[in-house]
Amino acid sequence: TIGMIYVGPKDDFGYNQSHYEAAMALKGMPGVKIVGEENVPETQAVQKTMQGMISQDGATLLFPTSFGYFNPHILDVAKKNADVRFSHCGGMWDAAKHPKNVGSFFGYIDECQYLNGVIAGHMTKSKKIGFVAAKPIPQVLRNINAFTLGAKSVKPDITCSVIFTGDWSMPVKEAEATNSLADQGVDVFTMHVDGPKVIVE
């Protein structure tokens, strides 16, 4: 049994949905059972969810997918459940510091954001590009830098304005941030939030 825990809705057309679709692909494999819970905040609630999946559903592998789930939540539950494997999406794991039943994975999104920046550099007429992001954590900052450097490789005098919404799934704030940047002359946008509403708006 594999447990999937999502910080937002599993149909957000973005981060959570990509994990959900991967879980559904696994579900089709013989002998694999998937349990999942969506909209689990980065609080004690995720510890209750993880422990419930272990105790009630028999999960032996958990994918708590949000950045803020790692410390202290995954670490605390992992210490109490040595026979369960925890795989965290966030690149926070350190073999020297963390339990052996914990690991992490993360994609090289910054490489794609660099290419997005190159495209933005060719597309912008105002030489003002924008980035709407959830939180100023290392992975997000790396993406902002990559996007900006990609754009500057095309037009060195481009500026990139950034607005942080404070959380991963805040569609209203994301739309407000995008509109605010547009009012400042930004004409090309990207994001590092869970869903693509900011781009659609």
Task: Provide a role label for each language-model segment.
Residues 1-201:
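A residue-level marker of the well-folded mature domains of exported/periplasmic proteins
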